[in-house]
């Protein structure tokens, strides 16, 4: 399935939340779902609910692709432990997600650009693959020149240290952060802009693999 390239505000209105963390909340101007019949809420089937939860998760992590969901599920489904937690961890510990959570970027899309354009270092080495899986103990920092980027300095200035997830550490002065421990399911859920039923998504994906 191709990556969504349409208006991001339309996605925010669909789910009724400023899902991408934009400074100007799109719901203030148009609070209703998009479309001619946006106000009419039809009762969804179980399949429809599964699709909606899947789309919510994709949006929360910057419109990730269907094949990335399937791949993540295949990697965890046969492992011991909480499948839902391990599945969600695959996205929360992506490099672009960690860059966003640390406050180096105001939105997940800005974080994706920082990574793709080669501004981000992992353990001192450049990594430009935004899906790179960050493991506990890895340090995330920025290139020296990148520390002066306006999108970085403005974002960090507005970053409230108290909002930093417990599984991360941040040294604002050094533009450096670290994934201290693997995040728990409830910790990840608290960082998402809207509730997502991960178990329903895993059930849906179980029929696709």
Curated annotation (Swiss-Prot):
Gene Ontology terms for molecular function: rRNA binding; structural constituent of ribosome
Domain of life of the organism encoding this protein: Bacteria
A Pfam cross-reference name: Ribosomal_S4
Protein's GO biological process: ribosomal small subunit biogenesis; translation
UniProt region (Disordered), positions on chain: 22-45
CDD domains registered for this protein in UniProt: S4
GO cellular component terms given for this protein: small ribosomal subunit
Keyword terms, alphabetized: Ribonucleoprotein, Ribosomal protein, RNA-binding, rRNA-binding
S4 RNA-binding domain span: 93-154
Protein family (similarity comment): Belongs to the universal ribosomal protein uS4 family.
Entries under PANTHER family matching the protein: 30S 40S RIBOSOMAL PROTEIN, SMALL RIBOSOMAL SUBUNIT PROTEIN US4M
Entry function: One of the primary rRNA binding proteins, it binds directly to 16S rRNA where it nucleates assembly of the body of the 30S subunit.
UniProt subunit comment: Part of the 30S ribosomal subunit. Contacts protein S5. The interaction surface between S4 and S5 is involved in control of translational fidelity.
Protein name: Small ribosomal subunit protein uS4
